């Protein structure tokens, strides 16, 4: 599955159909192919990008994760030392961009979360914000325990990675293939969900049922970003790749 398909079924939406036409059959696709063929090296920052380019450009492709300034990403709490209070509800954060809600799967994730909130109002708090300035968005996000993000992704992207660096637990894309590409075998901090409302609901309910896990997942989320996404490590990987292609 992806932003554009579920198995062999294309996700027909107005903007999807336009992007497919432009990038597969139109001038943007032709330009992208020309650049890929002409350049000396290609960096893929996500599993999705890597699997798209590798069949045709494996000889010039290098996977380098997205960068996060982990050092300047303060933790929401030192959950390695503090247990999750059993009487406290779990606070879930959802950032809504109305124009991209269906594309990113926010509509489905929010419906699943609202179902759980209606059933267990004393155990679930939902913070849903729409089109906030970035500083306000960050403040709202950092008041929560869990971020819901990118239903159709195999991999956490920048919004999720920033949240993970600060100790939030992410519900979204965390398929085994993305961990394998990183060489990550010992931790699984992301609550991986399929693009299905019932699957999202079941995963959220399980997290609330076992909220004592949140401190460990929070700790692993920070560790994940430190290991694989630290901006200085990523910058050095770019330099090394550039040097290897230059020689």
Q: Where do the protein language model's features map onto the residues?
A:
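Membrane-proximal helix-turn-helix segments that form the acceptor-binding/catalytic region
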Residues: 12-42
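Short hydrophobic beta-strand element within catalytic cores of glycosyltransferases
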Residues: 169-176
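Acidic donor-binding loop of glycosyltransferase active sites
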Residues: 142-155, 168
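Conserved donor-binding/catalytic core segment of Leloir-type glycosyltransferases
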Residues: 68, 72-75, 80-104, 110
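Helix-loop-beta element that forms the nucleotide-linked donor phosphate-binding surface
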Residues: 33-38, 42-44, 49-69
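A charged, aromatic-enriched C-terminal amphipathic alpha-helix characteristic of glycosyltransferases
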Residues: 212-243
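Short alpha-helical segment that forms part of, or immediately flanks, the ligand-binding pocket
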Residues: 138, 160-165, 179-180
């Amino acid at each position: 599955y992806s932003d554009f398909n579920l198995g062999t079924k294309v996700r027909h939406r107005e903007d999807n159909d336009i992007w497919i036409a432009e990038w597969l059959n139109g001038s943007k696709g032709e330009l992208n192919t020309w650049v890929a063929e002409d350049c000396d090296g290609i960096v893929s920052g996500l599993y999705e990008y890597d699997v798209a380019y590798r069949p045709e450009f494996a000889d010039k492709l290098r996977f380098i994760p997205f960068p996060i300034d982990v050092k300047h990403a303060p933790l929401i709490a030192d959950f390695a030392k503090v247990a999750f209070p059993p009487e406290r509800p779990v606070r879930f954060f959802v950032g809504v961009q109305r124009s991209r809600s269906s594309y990113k799967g926010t509509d489905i994730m929010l419906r699943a979360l609202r179902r759980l909130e209606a059933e267990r109002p004393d155990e679930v708090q939902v913070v849903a914000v729409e089109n906030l300035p970035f500083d306000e968005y960050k403040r709202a996000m950092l008041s929560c325990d869990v971020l819901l993000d990118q239903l159709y992704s195999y991999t956490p992207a920048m919004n999720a990675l920033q949240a993970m660096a600060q100790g939030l637990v992410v519900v979204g894309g965390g398929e085994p293939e993305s961990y394998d590409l990183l060489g990550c075998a010992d931790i699984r901090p992301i609550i991986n969900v399929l693009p299905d409302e019932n699957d999202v609901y079941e995963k959220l309910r399980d997290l609330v049922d076992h909220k004592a896990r949140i401190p460990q997942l929070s700790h692993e989320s920070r560790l994940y970003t430190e290991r694989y996404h630290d901006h200085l490590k990523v910058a050095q990987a770019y330099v090394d790749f550039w040097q290897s292609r230059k020689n």
